[in-house]
Amino acid sequence: MFIPPVDDVKPIPVPVEIYTQCITDASRFFGIDAELVFTLFDNEGGKVGTFSRNKNGTYDIGPMQINSSNLPEIRNHFPSVTWRVLAYDACASFWVGTWWLYRKIVDRKGNVFEGIADYNSKTPKVRATYIFNFMIKYNRRIQRRNGMDELYQWTQPKPQYNGHIVKNLPE
């Protein structure tokens, strides 16, 4: 069982330059849309040095909030990656988190959103809430990236020109 360190070190946010570069590189390597990984990081809310205790006694570690129950499997693939690395090396956390997401998507036969839900939980109710919140944040990221609200645009009738109407003319 994983027991986090007892210290007075406060978790610190990951600098924008670090998470931008590391997520971009890792997502490109694993062939995952970087916006999905950025959204996952945003949704998880982790920081360098974060240890979040779960109801089942496990911990979510570091910026990508990788669950401590996954440490043995991670060690099989990345022998030098320990909980300390995941907690305190932001870039390593992003690479391992992106790899973990990639594995979850592959396990779900390419279903991205099922893979994202699996990244967070196996509990159906928790998964449903998580993926709902994830999709809202993902849509906002896409809107910002594209400079428009894609979903809103698709669901609204096309604007029509009704002629030039002048209001508030002096009498």
Q: Language-model segments: which ranges?
A:
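Catalytic glycan-binding domains that act on GlcNAc-containing polysaccharides
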Residues: 2-165, 170
